[in-house]
Amino acid sequence: MKESELIGKVHSAVCHQCQQRGYAAPADVLVDVGVLPKEKYEDWRFGKVRYLEAVCTCNLKKLSFIMKQIRSYAKKSNLKPSFCYYKRWGVKKKHGHKPVIPLRFSKSGNPEIEKAYATHYVDLGRAEQLKKEKMEKAAAVQAGRLDKTSGMPEINISENNNG
């Protein structure tokens, strides 16, 4: 894939994610771009893979380029960086609580690289709009229930005057 095609795919993936949910996550961009199979991502989340880079289908140079393009698009689009702590899925409770097992993104474990992968980019305007839409939808559902019953259970009264 040409560099220009890859840039387009990365920018498109970030834009699409922001439209869908108000933020973009680098790991999801890697899935969308096609360099991280979804099943391998899930294996990593469940702790079956030591680090995320190991299951990506491209070399570290290309991964680094993709990460740079994500940051570039985020800066250009005024997306707010927000660190997200990634922990293992499917951890069983011990002594009443789940132990938190952090996930690793890179082979090196370099804190700057780890932070770059774990940083989500938030479209504050779109996130607020999605939150508002969700609240309006919940209110409409609630209002629909109340309209049908006028806040009270429906009672059918029939009069039989056979007198």
Question: What would you call each of these model-derived segments?
Answer:
Residues 4-27, 36-37, 43-55:
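Positively charged, polyanion-binding regions of nucleic-acid-associated proteins
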